[in-house]
Amino acid sequence: MIVHDLREESEFDPSKHIEKILGTLEGGDYTVACWEPGQVSPYHCHPDATEIYFCFEGGGIMRTLDGEVPVTPGAFIVHPPAELHEYENGSERTLLFRVRYGGEKYSRATQRRGYPDWKQSPEEVEYFKSVAAE
């Protein structure tokens, strides 16, 4: 049995959200994601992995190509492999419990709101070109 207290494991940074990997199991990992008010994730996907979020406390908005949904305590969101998504935190600190499983856990981003100097990596450019060509 593995036990974690998300509040005790939490780490916050005013300049960016923190994703602290708590452990790994065969085929995946599990994380506490810590968000300060107003922080926004990159608009990204995990080409080969499913990503699952559970809102422990706080909340915000999750966006995909299909629209947006409120993320509130108790909300459970599943992103299948390659689904583009962006999380924007609300007005209070938020703890999200995240599980990633399946293939490789890397992400590919298309944009990063609030970071004017951010640029896609060559791997990200190539990935989205290949997806558009399919």
PLM feature spans:
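Short acidic-glycine-tyrosine-enriched beta hairpin
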Residues: 66-81
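A short, N-terminal "cap"/entry segment at the start of jelly-roll beta-barrel domains
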Residues: 1-32, 42, 111-134
